[in-house]
Amino acid sequence: MARYKTAPWASPKVCAMTTPVLQILIASTRPGRVGPSVAAWIHERALAHGGFTVELIDLAEVNLPMFDEPNHPRLREYTHQHTKDWSATISRADAFIFVIPEYNYGFNAAIKNAIDYLNHEWKYKPVGFVSYGGVAAGTRAAQMLKQVVTTLKMHPLFETVSIPFVQQFLDADRRLQPNEIMETSATAMLDELVRTSGALQVLRAPAAGLTA
């Protein structure tokens, strides 16, 4: 009878379950932006979900300059401290939610710039999108950004949250008051982030973990 070796993804080092780190990125950086209000809502839902350790990251506070590294990100030969710090931040994550506006039928410059700084740090991590805007609810920006993240071997989810005419959902304190569709969509996206992050764990594991 043939004997089979243990599959590499069955290694205890790979299969050990830990709470995944979910990073929620606020893409908009302009004064008067709606992004923090939308992000605060999905942050609360992610915490209540209980499937993650959740981090909220505001690109306005990260304040990356326009991409200024002399070497290709694939080399990881970073020369600037802001790049090294950004690399360390993104390396912590197992999954992402990008909270994005739509500018002129596309995504905003700050999120593209933040993505372009790195390469390996994004690989094999799922990403969900919470988009907002006017009649199109930011969906065109989300669809365009999916083309970018797949190039970096990220896994964009089918499940998304799309918020049309976002101002109508803000109260006097600029807190987002979601409707039932938004709440249901958020739960579905968070559930899928947990499943997909777990499935991709073996690909994120270092080579040493696969051969131990």
Specify the residue positions occupied by each region the protein language model found.
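N-terminal beta1-alpha1-beta2 submodule of the flavodoxin-like/Rossmannoid cofactor-binding fold
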Residues: 5, 9-100, 105-113, 176-187, ...
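A short small-residue
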Residues: 18-24, 124-126, 164-173
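Alpha-helical structural signal in soluble globular domains
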Residues: 41-49, 117, 121, 148-151
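Mobile beta-alpha loop/short-helix "lid" or hinge segments that flank ligand
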Residues: 55-66, 120, 152-173
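A generic structural signal for secondary-structure junctions
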Residues: 71-72, 119, 150-153, 198
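Rossmann-fold NAD(P) dinucleotide-binding segment
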Residues: 108-124
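Short, glycine-/small-residue-rich phosphate/pyrophosphate-handling segment
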Residues: 123-167, 180-185
